[in-house]
């Protein structure tokens, strides 16, 4: 019964949408306990491309790469995969039909984020190749701090209120 309690619902009304219709939809989701916010559709697509679509695509890809390497490593990739690989690749167990459709329908934003990710990955490759420990340390320190801020925001748990005990569903409007 609490499937939507404390969860985000992002409305993406196109320009010209009847404000009363948006208000009714907002009320509907609020009544289900969702945290409702509005976003421009193109902005929504970019945000979801980086925080949802890209992680799924990368997980599918790394599982495929590991499987391809099985013959080279004599079946030791899967054999020795531990919790890090398991946790990271959990997303690859998602519905392939849904992710095919997501990729086809949000391809521009996904391709933009893949391009950015590829640039960042190339930066990481160069730092490793050149033995640039300072760049590696700076990158890992910065991104660890970002990950910790995600935990502090309560976004790292499946709990209905993201682990914020006693948190109430709130109506959040864009720009607040």
Tell where the protein language model's regions lie, with residue ranges:
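Internal alpha-helical scaffold of NAD(P)-dependent oxidoreductase catalytic cores
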Residues: 3-90
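A short, charged, Gly/Pro-tolerant segment at domain boundaries
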Residues: 139-149, 163-165
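A conserved regulatory-domain signal marking ACT and ACT-like small-molecule sensing domains
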Residues: 156, 164-176
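Amphipathic alpha-helical interaction surfaces
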Residues: 57-60, 94, 123, 149
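Amphipathic alpha-helical coiled-coil segments
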Residues: 149-157
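Interdomain hinge/lid region at the active-site interface
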Residues: 74-143
């Amino acid at each position: 019964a609490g499937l939507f309690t404390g969860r985000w619902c992002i409305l993406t009304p196109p320009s010209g949408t009847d404000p009363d219709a948006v208000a009714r939809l907002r009320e509907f989701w609020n009544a289900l306990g969702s945290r409702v916010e509005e976003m421009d559709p193109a902005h929504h697509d970019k945000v979801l491309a980086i925080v949802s679509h890209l992680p799924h695509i990368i997980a599918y890809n790394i599982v495929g790469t590991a499987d391809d390497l099985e013959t080279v490593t004599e079946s030791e990739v899967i054999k020795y995969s531990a919790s890090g690989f398991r946790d990271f690749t959990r997303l690859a167990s998602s519905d392939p039909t849904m992710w095919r459709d997501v990729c086809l329908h949000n391809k521009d934003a996904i391709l933009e984020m893949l391009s950015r990710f590829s640039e960042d990955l190339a930066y990481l490759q160069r730092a490793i190749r050149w033995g640039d420990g300072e760049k590696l340390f700076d990158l890992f320190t910065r991104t660890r701090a970002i990950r910790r801020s995600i935990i502090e925001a309560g976004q790292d748990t499946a709990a209905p209120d993201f682990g914020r005990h006693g948190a109430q569903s709130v109506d959040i409007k864009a720009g607040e």
